[in-house]
Design a protein with these regions (language model features):
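Membrane-proximal, glycine/serine-rich, low-complexity loop/turn segments characteristic
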Residues: 1-110, 127-164, 198-218, 256-258, ...
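Extracellular loop and loop/strand-boundary signature of outer-membrane beta-barrel proteins
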Residues: 15-17, 65-70, 121-128, 178-185, ...
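Residues that define the transmembrane beta-barrel architecture of outer-membrane proteins
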Residues: 24-28, 74-78, 132-136, 189-193, ...
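Outer membrane beta-barrel strand-and-loop segments of large Gram-negative receptors
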Residues: 192-196, 238-242, 349-351, 355, ...
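Signature of Gram-negative outer-membrane beta-barrel scaffolds
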Residues: 209-314, 447, 451
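Outer-membrane beta-barrel translocator domains and adjoining extracellular loop/strand segments
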Residues: 54-64, 107-121, 166-175, 222-230, ...
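C-terminal extracellular loops and terminal segments
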Residues: 409-413, 430-508, 513
């Protein structure tokens, strides 16, 4: 057995990839690892050169009008990573790495508004946005092992992230519109520090105790300026600046206790946290120097219990019962009240007062081990408190426009069944599949107009409580066909059934991907080919009647082929010291229209 202080080795990996449908997408990377005695050095470089087209339309039957969207993104990013692991002795390890990411992107957009019954009202918006940002990550880790197999240990990890970005956007308008052209300048500075202390102690062969402390400190400052984005009380477009300061500090502690009996095992846990959120949006009218401040604070203390029970009456049968409560906090993009994007008929903003959502889950599962695989069946119930979701409201300054934002819905409940399986019918064919069917009930506040938009007033906006009952299902299957030791083929299929929420009814989404892999040069090199969405069916379609009737569809470059080549070199098998995986517990924005 080689001890840590005598291990020597060098290895690396080179990757090249090219994807294409309408536009090329290229990526490459190289990573290397060198181990000499107590020191392990590693580094990598990767780049992505992407061009993407997105397009869609929204039709409004009440006025027989259509919005036609065309967007084009061109981005370049470079990621550099370097790190070192220092094995002081068999029990103590120090580790440090840094990531440096440089991004440069541009987006061009065009929105046409077409009124089929009154073409003289047709108008158009174009925009050009440039975005540059740099992000840095610095990570330190110290681990102390109390025994030879490292099962009893204490570990300290400190992670610090810095983000700085600048964006400038030019919006231009043509046709039947009185809206002036305007620019937008945005500067973003973000700092995130996370400190974790984890302790693991196997008290015996059948008992395990884990304890931990965590601090997460986050601050985000955005400075925004525009010469004609906002309107004053008289309806005049005015130059403004807005500063949005968002800070969130989280301090938490957790404990889990697990024990194995003859045929039973269980693990119970509890995490407690205290959270302090402070936000301030400060808008200045550059014509009058009038200042409007909107503060919002949210302090709370929460606990998150969990329990997992497993019963193994035999090698072929396993029963599981679990309960958990978790949190999904709003992402910074969801709480940012500054404009995300806009068209002549849509404006998208975050919601500064967005609350976190909490999910309580109960699951019961049964697993049957077969001669050629396994099958798992289960039932579940989930209750989501203050669910975060997209919301659509009527723009009070122009009742023909909508405001797209995020809101907390009332409690959402769902129950259903799940099936999953991995099975090998033959020595050359393996299958992994899953299916879930669930019933969901949502309750929230929504808005709608009771008369056509051309004659509507603010008094025609109805605010009402809406209940939506929905049954939905999802299916996915992955097949792998091994022709020889070096050649294999794959096929993946996905289907998401029709789905309904407070605002929209989403149409089914489905696609099929195929691929192949071929290894050569003594399995050191691998060539891969993937063809995604081979029938070109993947798209997002919806119908809605709040605040007024509309139907739409959005598409992207999903029907792509991909060529990849990778090559492993060197004789060593050493890798950088891994980090513990942690739950981000933050809900991401949609990143698009709906």
């Amino acid at each position: 057995i080689l001890h840590k202080n005598v291990n020597i080795g060098f290895n690396g990996n080179l990757n090249l990839g090219l994807a294409y449908e309408r536009n090329p997408k290229f990526n490459s990377s190289i990573d290397m690892n060198y181990r000499s005695g107590k020191l392990n050095f590693y580094g990598s470089y990767g780049n992505n050169l992407n061009e993407n087209a997105n397009f869609g339309n929204i039709f409004r039957p009440d006025e027989n009008s259509e919005q036609i969207f065309n967007f084009f993104d061109d981005s370049k990013s470079h990621l550099i990573k370097a790190g070192i692991d220092f094995y002081l002795n068999d029990n103590n390890t120090l580790s440090f790495f840094t990531n440096q990411n440089i991004f440069d992107g541009a987006t061009e957009g065009n929105t046409d508004i077409i009124y089929n019954n009154a073409t003289t009202f047709n108008n158009q918006q174009t925009f050009l946005s440039d975005n540059e940002n740099d992000s840095q990550q610095y990570n330190f880790n110290y681990k102390l092992d109390f025994n030879e197999d490292s099962s009893h240990n204490i570990e300290l990890e400190v992670d610090h992230n810095i983000y700085e970005g600048d964006a400038n956007t030019l919006n231009r308008f043509f046709g039947a519109t009185t809206r002036p052209n305007f620019f937008e300048l945005t500067n973003t500075e973000r700092d995130r520090t996370t400190i974790n202390l984890d302790y693991v102690n196997p008290l015996s062969d059948s008992v395990k105790l884990e304890l931990g402390l965590q601090a997460r400190l986050f601050e985000n400052i955005i400075d925004y300026e525009s010469n004609a984005r906002s309107q004053n009380s008289m309806g005049t477009y005015i130059p403004t600046t807005t500063n949005f300061d968002y800070s969130r500090n989280i301090y938490s502690a957790y404990a889990t206790y697990g024990k194995k009996l003859e045929k039973w095992s269980y693990q119970v846990g509890l995490r407690a946290e205290t959270v302090k959120v402070e936000t301030l949006a400060r808008e200045t009218d550059l014509q009058t120097n009038a200042v409007t401040e909107i503060p919002f604070d949210n302090d709370y203390v929460q606990v998150y219990p969990s329990a997992f029970f497993t019963y193994n009456p035999s090698e072929k049968n396993t029963y599981q019962l679990s309960y958990s409560r978790r949190i999904d906090r709003p992402g910074v993009g969801q709480v940012n009240p500054l404009p995300e994007w806009n068209t002549p008929l849509i404006s998208s903003f975050g919601n500064q007062e967005l609350q976190p959502q909490f999910t309580n889950s109960v699951e019961v599962n049964y697993t049957r081990n077969l001669e050629k695989g396994s099958v798992t069946a289960g039932v579940f119930y989930r209750l989501v408190e203050d669910e975060i979701s997209r919301a659509v409201f009527v723009d009070r300054s122009n009742l023909n426009r909508i405001i797209l934002t995020y809101d907390n819905f009332d409690n959402t409940s769902a129950y259903g069944i799940e099936f999953s399986s991995n099975y090998r019918p033959t020595t050359w064919w393996s299958i992994n599949g899953s299916f879930d069917l669930y019933s969901q009930t949502q309750t929230s506040i929504s808005e709608r107009l009771t008369v056509p938009t051309d004659v509507a007033t603010i008094n025609d906006i109805v605010i009402e409580s809406v209940d939506v009952d929905n049954v939905a299902w999802n299916f996915r299957m992955f097949n792998n066909f091994k022709v020889s030791k070096s050649l294999s083929f794959s096929a993946f299929g996905f289907y998401r059934g029709q789905n309904r929420n407070i605002q929209f009814e989403m149409k089914p989404m489905y696609f099929v991907n195929v691929g192949m892999r071929y290894s050569f040069l003594d399995s050191k090199a691998t060539f891969s080919f993937n063809y995604n969405d081979i029938f070109n069916t993947m798209r997002f379609g919806f119908d809605g009647d709040r605040p007024f009737a509309q139907t739409g569809e959005f598409n992207w470059e999903s029907n792509t082929w991909f060529l990849g080549l990778s090559y492993r070199f060197g004789s060593g098998k050493y890798r950088a010291k891994s980090r513990k995986r942690r739950d981000k517990d933050e809900k991401e924005g949609s990143g698009g229209v709906f």
